[in-house]
């Protein structure tokens, strides 16, 4: 009789958040796609810039800083107007980072937003130093955009 060893599967951190919001899919898509405004309202985001942009794709860099730790990561985003934004890592402290946003209309004035992110840091040291900060930031994204929508669209 052989002794089977359990296979240890390395599970990448995953973050999934969903929210129903009283704003249109188009309004929420525009907020999420407005990368240059991120430092104004995203906790931990200290800078952002668009490196390249076409109607269906955008490459953007985001600077994240918290507790004295600063990192920049760049993603290439596939854009489907008012429906989805799919992100793929170009550069940053990750071995892997994929994810995105989906905007599903529920009515003219409401939609469901979904945010999903799979990521793995390049090494344990970076994960120890930056992991909690990044997970916290990513986990609060939907909330931050919901609050931002209220500020931007309720003022109209």
Where are these regions (language model features)?
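Hydrophobic/aromatic beta-strand elements that line small-molecule binding cavities or substrate pockets
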Residues: 17-19, 49, 73-78, 98-105, ...
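Beta-strand/loop substructures that line and gate deep hydrophobic ligand-binding cavities in soluble
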Residues: 89-140
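Hydrophobic ligand-binding cavity/cleft-lining segments
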Residues: 8-56, 155
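Glycine-rich portal/gate segments that line the openings of hydrophobic small-molecule binding cavities
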Residues: 49-91, 144, 148
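A short, structured loop/turn motif at beta-sheet edges
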Residues: 25, 51-56, 78-82, 102-112
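Beta-strand elements of well-folded, non-transmembrane domains
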Residues: 21-25, 64-68, 79-83, 93-95, ...
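Short, small-residue-biased leader/transition segments that mark boundaries at the very start
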Residues: 1-5
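Short, highly charged C-terminal tails/helix-capping segments
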Residues: 146-156
């Amino acid at each position: 009789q052989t002794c089977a060893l359990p296979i240890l599967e390395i599970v990448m951190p995953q973050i999934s958040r969903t929210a129903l919001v009283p704003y249109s899919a188009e309004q929420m898509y525009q907020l999420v796609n407005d990368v240059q405004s991120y430092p104004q309202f995203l906790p931990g985001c200290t800078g952002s810039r668009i490196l390249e942009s076409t109607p269906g794709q955008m490459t953007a860099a985001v600077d994240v800083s918290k507790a004295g730790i600063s990192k920049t990561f760049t993603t290439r985003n596939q854009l489907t107007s008012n429906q989805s934004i799919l992100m793929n890592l170009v550069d940053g402290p990750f071995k892997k980072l994929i994810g995105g946003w989906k905007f599903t209309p529920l009515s003219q004035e409401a939609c469901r937003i979904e945010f999903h992110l799979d990521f793995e840091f390049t090494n344990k040291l970076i994960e120890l130093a930056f992991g909690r900060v990044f997970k916290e930031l990513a986990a609060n994204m939907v909330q931050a955009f919901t609050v931002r929508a209220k500020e931007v669209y309720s003022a109209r």
